[in-house]
Curated annotation (Swiss-Prot):
GO terms for cellular component: cytoplasm. It comes from Acidovorax sp. (strain JS42). It comes from the Bacteria. Its main location: cytoplasm. This is Molybdenum cofactor guanylyltransferase. The lineage of its organism: Bacteria, Pseudomonadati, Pseudomonadota, Betaproteobacteria, Burkholderiales.
Length: 211
């Protein structure tokens, strides 16, 4: 069993926000709070500690009361750069990554990923959720690679991968024992993994999960 206090949560807020017009996603308003602060409040009960990966407006993120770390890799290198920063700074055996733009993620995310990691003896546990195919509307369960529980012993592997130019999460995770955890059970929120790439999508999310 993985104890809650053996997991550090990492909020990924280091992106460019290009599809939001270049704004800092994590600081956009969601139900009266900055999006990253809402994410922090949802994540904190699930883990022992939380930190934020951000690359601008660091003082604003620091005001949330948790450590804030920028990417070590240059030029907004993507989520794996955040993974790398988190693994470098993590002081617990496990790191749980959560993006700042998916505010309805499950309240039992950490517990279910941890159970799967232990059950399968995996180094990584990754969430999966139903998604409609844009072409034909068919609903399939797809992995959500930014929602990952990682052993901190994977740091050396990720350093090698990124130094070799690797930037895609799935290309790295497929090198390791990875448990995939589908969040498609009765009672699971079908909107839990909806993310906001635009301000319109963010406003639409505000009305979900309240009914």
């Amino acid at each position: 069993m993985i104890d809650t206090h053996d997991i550090t949560g990492l909020i990924l807020a280091g992106g460019r926000g290009s599809r939001m017009g270049g704004v800092d996603k994590g600081l956009q308003n969601f139900r009266g709070l900055p999006l990253a602060l809402h994410t922090l409040m949802r994540l904190q009960p699930q883990v022992g500690d939380v930190m934020i990966n951000a690359n601008r407006n660091l003082a604003a993120y620091e005001s949330f009361g948790v450590p804030v770390w920028p990417d070590g890799l240059a030029d907004y290198a993507g989520p794996l750069a955040g993974f790398l920063t988190g693994l470098e700074r993590c002081e617990t055996p496990w790191l749980l990554t959560v993006p700042c733009d998916t505010p309805l993620f499950p309240p039992d995310l950490a517990a279910r990923l941890a159970q799967a990691a232990m059950r399968e003896g995996a180094d990584i546990a990754m969430a999966a959720a139903p998604e409609a195919d844009e072409r034909d509307g068919t609903v399939r369960v797809r992995t959500q690679p930014v929602f990952c529980l990682l052993r901190v012993t994977l740091l050396e592997s990720l350093v090698r991968f990124t130094q070799g130019g690797g930037r895609k999460i799935d290309r790295w995770t497929e090198q390791h024992a990875c448990a995939v955890v589908p969040f498609d059970q009765p009672g699971d929120d079908p909107h839990a993994f909806y993310n906001a790439n635009t301000l319109a999508e963010l406003h639409a999310l505000e009305g979900l999960g309240l009914r």
